[in-house]
Amino acid sequence: MLRFCFVCCLWLVAVSNAARAESPAERGDYLVNTIMACGNCHSPRDANGQLIREKAFSGGLTFDTPAFVATAPNITPDRETGIGSWSDAEIKRALVEGVRPNHGRLAGVALAAIMPANFYKALLPDDLDAIVAYLRAVKPIRNAVADSVYKAAVRRDPYPDAEAGFGSAAFADPVRRGAYLVTIGHCMECHSAWSKGTSDFKTGLGRGGRVFPPREGSPEGAPGSTASNITPHPTAGIGAWTDREIARAITEGVGPGGRTLKPPMAYIYYARLKETDLADIIAYLRSVPPLQ
């Protein structure tokens, strides 16, 4: 009898663990719709700047910059206007290298520099598989967007943590787990020092100052914005903020004193972050060298 009960308990534990197990598509859903915030660029918005959820990922914001004019493309599995005809390997290459497949109307053409392939390069193989599984599962929507116009060669500044990569040992450390999330979330793409189209990740990591004019990453009609200093500097950055204040800014878009954060800050996506992931992100931000 005791043996039977013990076996039953083991079976119940196994069933419980299986019930909690996350499928690749679920993991992809979590990454795409939280820290990576893919819909922030790739989903259309209404006249009030609100996401049109029933048209998610069918093409979104237009970026009109000195180097290029590009509309975030349709990444639904529609075969004609989206990525439905792309192989898994081609989707992964677009993510981590920023290059389209060698077939179709735009064969081999680089994706615009706003696509953060220099950050996505850090994605772990299992996470890449998960993202592809999720994108395959979203509703296909027929929607052709305008072709990109390039005024200069596409360039992406190497991001140190993405170049170094993340081994499995890194995930035992909350700070390194946070670094991975901040990397694939391309937070420092906006929040690092920026000059003449070049990011300064070496001496300006997290210092902010990048200016986003109204047509560079903001919904139609929205004002421009300037990325904030997110280093732990006590006055210029977030060093004096509590963990709760940092968490609220990330997930609600509200800073200390009630200041509302502006686009392209993707707090509506970050609101779904797991508490553990949010804590790791904060731990990493606390570890960044303070800059003024």
Regions found by a protein language model. Name each.
Residues 17-33, 48, 155-183, 196-198, ...:
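Electrostatic cytochrome c docking/interface patches
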